[in-house]
Each structure stands twice: as structure tokens, then as C-alpha cells.
């Protein structure tokens, strides 16, 4: 098979591993810089051009699109969908996952466990917003944040008010969530491939840090999931329409709650923590599912 990995950096661990895993299984794997792709969208025969030439037909495309290029990246994926190429994650699903509020609304509507969550831009009654989600301690997030940036823990209602007032000054959209104290600064990253959790790790925040992101000095270890945690991760992936994703779960007194569904999960942390060849499992999924026009939206989304 001929497979394209859409990635801005061929040296990233995840990109390298996908290429290695594909080639080890006898496939041709090209790494394509998403932003260097360009298209004539009025052509009767859809195509993607790159470095002055039309790209060949690919049996599958693996989008590795960073949050900062979501708009253009999903347009490129959509063009491949219009060409009939199988895309591991569809453009509509990627766009959906990048909108944190929309994601939480969809998950809530389908009954997926979530922390109590409020959403605001410029609330005229800050105290009521805080009260509505159960009061401090609270986690306050900028909607556009990634890797733990723009995430603050407010220990008291007064602190929460001050943080919200500061964030409002940025003219930003804000999420306010209950703090799951019993999670102890840890979360579980479930790596889902084709409606199955293929690997899972527990990420523990550094001492004194409530955020468990590995980019912020957290550590990761292999974890055994309960049936409920496994089902929650798979259900969240289905609701979001993602074939390959990372589902971040907190262990609360009321059962597992989903914090985020990541459409471009990194491989380094999960492979190192679990000693599993996750990249090869992604390739297995492609081999079983990559058929022409096997994309639900077919670029119409």
C-alpha cells in the first residue's frame, strides 16, 4: 500500500514511528508537509499538489495535524477525502475534536461521564457561574489552550473570581470545571484504534503540579483499565467519530470522567510506558479498512 503521513516535521517521534512501522510491513510511506500542499478546488478531478507536482494516489492518509494549523490541515484532509482516499481520521471529526466546547456538548448529550463544567465568555454574574459548577476548588481553562497551557487551579471562590476576571480581560472563551481531587493529579491516557483501547498509561503530574501533561514534567506508567474505563474511552471515540485518538480520563468517585479526546495523540509516551508497538497497530487498522471512498463524509463535511 501507499500511505501518506501529513506532518510538519519528519523528525518527530510519532511521525518517524509511523513511517518505520509502515515500511516494516512492506508499505511505501511518504511524509507530506501539510502546509506545503496546495489545491485547485475548482477542478472536475480533485487533486493535491506538492513541490510543483500532483501527488500520486494514496491508499491511506494519516493526518498528524497540530492545533495551530487545524483550519488549513482539515481542508487538505477534506481534499484527499474528495479524491476517494481513506483518511484514518476524517476532517469533520478532527475539526470537531479541536472545538473543546463542542466536544464536551456532544459527549454530554450521549451520556459520557464528564466533570461538572461551565462555559462563559463575559459572564455578568461571576459568582453565579462559580456556584453553578459546585464552587471551589475549580479548574479554569482557556478554551484554546493545549498541553496544559492556560489551565489554572483555583483553591477558593475568591481566587476563582480573580482568575475569571483576568481571563475575561483577554476576551477569551473560558471553561470552568470541578476539580476531581480524588484523581490525585493523575489521569489515564487511553489510546484507541478502531473502537478498541490498544494501550493505556497513567500520567502523574510532577510534585506540586495538578496538570499531568508529560510536556510539563509528568511521568507515565503502564495501567490496567477497568471495564468501565475501557468502555468510556471507546464510547468517547465513537461519539467523536475518531478511528485513532487519545482519550484522557480521570478516576472520580462517580466513575471515570472524560477530560479530552485528542485526534492527534503522540506515540512516544504511550509506547515507552507500555512497551507496545502502537504504530504497528495503527498500520494494522489501515490494512483492514483502507478502501477507496471508505470515508463517511467523502469530503462533504
From Swiss-Prot:
EC number: 6.3.2.-
Residues annotated to bind Mg(2+) 2: 260, 262
Keyword ATP-binding: yes
GO biological process, any: SOS response
Requisite cofactors: Mg(2+); Mn(2+)
Cofactor note: Binds 2 magnesium or manganese ions per subunit.
This protein's UniProt keywords: ATP-binding, Ligase, Magnesium, Manganese, Metal-binding, Nucleotide-binding, Protein biosynthesis
InterPro entries hit by this protein: ATP-grasp (IPR011761), ATP-grasp_RimK-type (IPR013651), ATP_grasp_subdomain_1 (IPR013815), RimK (IPR023533), Rimk_N (IPR041107), Rp_bS6_RimK/Lys_biosynth_LsyX (IPR004666)
Amino acids binding Mn(2+) 2: 260, 262
Family recorded in the similarity comment: Belongs to the RimK family.
Protein known as: Probable alpha-L-glutamate ligase
Organism per entry: Saccharophagus degradans (strain 2-40 / ATCC 43961 / DSM 17024)
Amino acid at each position: 500500500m501507499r500511505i501518506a503521513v501529513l506532518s510538519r516535521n519528519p523528525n518527530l517521534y510519532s511521525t518517524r514511528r509511523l513511517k518505520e512501522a509502515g515500511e516494516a510491513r512492506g508499505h511505501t510511506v511518504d511524509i507530506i508537509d501539510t502546509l506545503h500542499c496546495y489545491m485547485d478546488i475548482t477542478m472536475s478531478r480533485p487533486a493535491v499538489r506538492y513541490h510543483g507536482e500532483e501527488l500520486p494516489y494514496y491508499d491511506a492518509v494519516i493526518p498528524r495535524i497540530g492545533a495551530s494549523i487545524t483550519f488549513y490541515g482539515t481542508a487538505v484532509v477534506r481534499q484527499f477525502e474528495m479524491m476517494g482516499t481513506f483518511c484514518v481520521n476524517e476532517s469533520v471529526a478532527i475539526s470537531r475534536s479541536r472545538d473543546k466546547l463542542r466536544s464536551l456538548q456532544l459527549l454530554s448529550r450521549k451520556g459520557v461521564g464528564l466533570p461538572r463544567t461551565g462555559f462563559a465568555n463575559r459572564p455578568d454574574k461571576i459568582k453565579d457561574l462559580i456556584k453553578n459548577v459546585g464552587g471551589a476548588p475549580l479548574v479554569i481553562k482557556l478554551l484554546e489552550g493545549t498541553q496544559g497551557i492556560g489551565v489554572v487551579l483555583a483553591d477558593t471562590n475568591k481566587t476563582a473570581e480573580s482568575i475569571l476576571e483576568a481571563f475575561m480581560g483577554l476576551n477569551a472563551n473560558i471553561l470552568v470545571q470541578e476539580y476531581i481531587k480524588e484523581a490525585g493529579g493523575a489521569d489515564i491516557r487511553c489510546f484507541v484504534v478502531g473502537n478498541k483501547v490498544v494501550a493505556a498509561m497513567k500520567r502523574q503530574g510532577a510534585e506540586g503540579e495538578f496538570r499531568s501533561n508529560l510536556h510539563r514534567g509528568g511521568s507515565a506508567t503502564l495501567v490496567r483499565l477497568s471495564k468501565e474505563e475501557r468502555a468510556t474511552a471507546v464510547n468517547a471515540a465513537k461519539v467523536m467519530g475518531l478511528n485513532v485518538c487519545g482519550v484522557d480520563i480521570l478516576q472520580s468517585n462517580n466513575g471515570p470522567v472524560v477530560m479530552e479526546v485528542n485526534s492527534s495523540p503522540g506515540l512516544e509516551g504511550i509506547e515507552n510506558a507500555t512497551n507496545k508497538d502502537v504504530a504497528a497497530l495503527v498500520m494494522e487498522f489501515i490494512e483492514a479498512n483502507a478502501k477507496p471512498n471508505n470515508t463517511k463524509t467523502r469530503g462533504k463535511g
